[in-house]
Amino acid sequence: EDVIMVTDPAYGPVAGTTDTLQMLRKIWPSLKTARMIGSSALSISYVAAGRMDIFVHHRLQPYDQAAGLILMEEAGGLVTDREGNRAQLYSDGLIASSSIIHQQFMEITKHLQWRKPSSRSLNPRER
């Protein structure tokens, strides 16, 4: 494929880093390349602009994704959590892409630990 993925395994040895690396290993044959830009907001913006094809992240803070959610929606893209539900500010993980690429990604990763929800909510009202 000619798919360019943007991701970031997060800083340091945090929960989800190993799962992200496992996900990359599984999806690598379907990619042209993968990039780590270092800014989730910029990465999502690149997907919205069509410069990259898919952005995935295990766990983001609301401030990391707020602008990207709007940009992707306005660009006609699809943004979901790791389970495939429409993304919200406190979503558990993020997948941003076109609907076709999203469907392919979800199929390839359906049995991976990366797709399972985290036990800790990011929403301060639920802690």
Which residue ranges define each predicted feature?
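An extended, acidic
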Residues: 1-127
